[in-house]
């Protein structure tokens, strides 16, 4: 059941999104291999780094909404020099990553408070995976932390970007037009904040409850 909810099970022509979904008897099912990262979030960021040709090697990085550390793990495995990992929660972050000297973990910390802790203009690359809030709410703090020409690569979750009335039962956005409008709102916010958008792509795996998610990348141009 967990594999289905994680978007890891598919038939030859479609991905299964519900454990109760019916398929024809005898049909072949394919299960995606397990992640090499501490969480499946690493696979999402891996896709974004490849799609937008972003190389973290030697860079000072920021992970907003680090949770268990999938994004942080991906950055480190790609050669990041350091990662400031931030989350409002606590006791979720991987024990293995906690021991890594390249990681500075800020738990129980809102991103808006981070510039006062670490200073301004200190990161080359920021990545983000936040829930129950819009990516646009973290933009001002991220911009303050980014160096000139720094890159911001974020996961965009339409279920937290779209108006409440456009989110379907169970918190799932099934309407493609609603998903695209949500993505466009974040894209527009990027441009208004001073980020030149390099592109967007769909996440290789779905989010919670099968929600389609996107990756959006921008480079600071002012």
Annotate each predicted stretch with a short phrase.
Residues 1-25, 60:
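A basic, amphipathic helix-loop patch mediating RNA/tRNA/ribosome contacts
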Residues 57-67:
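Conserved class I S-adenosyl-L-methionine
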Residues 74-82:
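Conserved S-adenosyl-L-methionine
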Residues 84-133, 137:
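S-adenosyl-L-methionine
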Residues 136-153:
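A short glycine-rich, Lys/Arg-flanked "PGG" loop and its adjoining helix->strand segment in the class I
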Residues 158-175:
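Short, glycine-/aromatic-enriched active-site segment of Class I SAM-dependent methyltransferases
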Residues 205-222:
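Core SAM-dependent methyltransferase catalytic element
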